Amino acid sequence: MIRPALRTDWTLEEARAIHALPFPELMHRAQTLHRAHFDPTAIETASLLSIKTGGCPEDCGYCSQSAHHDTGVKATKLMGTEEVLAAARRAKAAGAQRFCMGAAWRSPKDRDMDRLCDMVRGVADLGLETCMTLGMLSPGQVARLKAAGLDFYNHNIDTSPAYYARIASTRTMEDRLETVEQVRRGGIKVCCGGILGMGEAEEDRIALLVTLATLPAHPDSVPVNLWNEIEGVPVQGRAQAVDPFALVRIVALARILMPASVVRLSAGRTEMSDELQALCFLAGANSIFVGDQLLTTGNPAAWKDRDLLSRLGLHVAPARARPPVAAD
């Protein structure tokens, strides 16, 4: 199958028109492009661990880990390397191909970089792909993580540029985009997506994807999150459940605008029926988090995911070969 050239010049008008297509036509276009770039029966699996929880100085209105909100989440110190590696071994045994490590920071301190790099090297030595989400990074920190063997860096933009100011004030959309570009220029694969269900309009969801699809290069991985009900955060008062078909349309639009990117169903799968997840896979989603816990929210039990993939005739995608990491 011929793969159409990837575009980074999408317009909001084009995206609106695609999003509004009759459902069968939208699904057909998304599935056609999905098949051009991926095995449509293969699902990538990742596991996520909070290596430093709570006490974050940012005021993101959706987040239970912000120090600005009374959510009952207790701040912890950065975990030790051996504790992280033990969790990575469990994740691999449970079927994860990628191990993602998240810290609730505005940005990592230089004093923590040695330990973070040790974590990356240790996880890579287990044969897992490595991913981190640590907040904003300096060019020097990007270089150190790259040298340690970090495969992916997650830094979501959360929502549309127009709606962003209603979500956070301590970090701007421009800050987020600069971090994404910093990571890309440093040679680390970019994981960047957003969150649905925070009171945003349909237009904001479309604009979120257009923002990602018009970056200098598409993110390698695009996580699609549903906001989880969290007590004590500002978003709680205006959050609205996302219509199931609206979610599928967004997944399909992500696949069409960014056909070579992995599209991950991330937070919120506990609220999705098996039928909804199946439609999302048909629309082009091809990755999930496995394990009972994400950062501070739940996730479907491993047996449920195995059962769902089996019933759909899907399989876990084979792990990609990792390039050798140069010694320090």
From Swiss-Prot:
Keywords: 2Fe-2S, 4Fe-4S, Biotin biosynthesis, Iron, Iron-sulfur, Metal-binding, S-adenosyl-L-methionine, Transferase
E.C. designation(s): 2.8.1.6
Radical SAM core domain mapped to chain residues: 41-260
A GO molecular-function descriptor: 4 iron, 4 sulfur cluster binding
Protein function: Catalyzes the conversion of dethiobiotin (DTB) to biotin by the insertion of a sulfur atom into dethiobiotin via a radical-based mechanism.
Subunit field text: Homodimer.
Name of this protein: Biotin synthase
Classification of source organism: Bacteria, Pseudomonadati, Pseudomonadota, Alphaproteobacteria, Rhodobacterales
